[in-house]
Amino acid sequence: IVGQISLGAIDLGSMRTGVIGYWVDQRYAGHGFAPMAVALLADWAFCDPTGPRLHRMEIALLPENERSRRVACKVGCHYEGVRPRYMFVNGQWRDHETYSLFAEDAGDGFIHRLIARHAMPESVQS
């Protein structure tokens, strides 16, 4: 197994929101699997007629988890701030940074933008 991605805490009421969670096996980390999975999930959840047609999704990550932060940034997430004592991790309540995606950000699709961005030479991306 390369990893896992999930969309949970879905609210189909007035908020139309969900929470993205993911992990990647250490052997496959850094190869682009997580950003690709998040982009595909976002396109499905926001735009696909078979998806829940959400308005907002969020990712919460530990402040020291630089790899997860890079995933959120590569996909185009918006940094929202730190949530104190947000999640119980390894026996203690830990602060988490929160990042969000919005349906209005989808444009031609998160996956399309991710592929296009990484297909361009790095000097052109800036």
Name the predicted role of every residue range:
Residues 1-126:
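Acyl-donor (CoA/ACP) binding surface of acyl/acetyltransferases
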